[in-house]
Amino acid sequence: MKICIGICLSKKNKRFIIRSINSLNQLFVPDDCKLEIAYVLPNNFFYFKDFIIRKFEEKKINLNFLSISRGGIPYARNKYLSFCRSKKYHYISFLDDDCEIDRSWLFEMIKLIKSENADIIGGPQNHKVNDSNIKNYFKIIEPNYKHKQTIKWAATNNVLFKNIILNDKKIKFDINLDKVGGSDQLFFYYLWSKGYKIIWNKKAIVTEGLHESRKKIDWFLKRNFRYG
């Protein structure tokens, strides 16, 4: 079984990137899985390539590096989709570049997508934060579904889906949402509207490092607007 995790590098904060890589290095990979990771980097970030390679040198994971000539998350996500269309992966995933994943994340994702005969699995994102006000904001805006609940959309901070979905070459992220965000929610909502089954996996957890910009109320308001 071939699986690829896609990570779009959008920040230059090495502290968060190192934490992400360290968690990937600790990830439990079932014996029947061949795992690859694809990093999508803007041209001006490509110097990170050697740094990432060094961090993974003791782990037997095939690394892929994709470059984009212009910034913008939807462009990076579409670059990854194009790459996956040319490969024979069974499942592909998106994770954020500032998130740490639980050691059992991959096992839990594979287990549920098979047992529920799902097309797409979404999961929760926890947050490293001590401020009680910030914690309350996250409780308001973050999805809180039951385990195995059928849902209508997922986010690219924690998702795994069947690569066969990409046989439809029209499926892509909307670049018109580059400046406002929300292209991932719209992408997976569209797939749900086409009949694809999306299930919530409460046991496959990722944890986000909190950026200073996200401690401000205006950031929460904008994010809540995107979530609807």
Show the residue positions of the predicted features.
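Short beta-strand-to-loop acidic/aromatic patch adjacent to the donor-nucleotide binding site
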Residues: Y89-E100
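Catalytic beta-strand/loop signature of glycosyltransferases that borders the donor
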Residues: I198-L210
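Catalytic core of nucleotide-sugar-dependent glycosyltransferases
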Residues: S193-Y196, V206, K216-G228
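Acidic donor-binding loop at a coil-to-helix junction in glycosyltransferase catalytic cores
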Residues: D178-Y189
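Conserved donor NDP-sugar-binding/catalytic core segment of glycosyltransferases
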Residues: S104-I134
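Glycine-rich, basic loop-to-helix element that forms the pyrophosphate-binding segment
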Residues: S67-S86
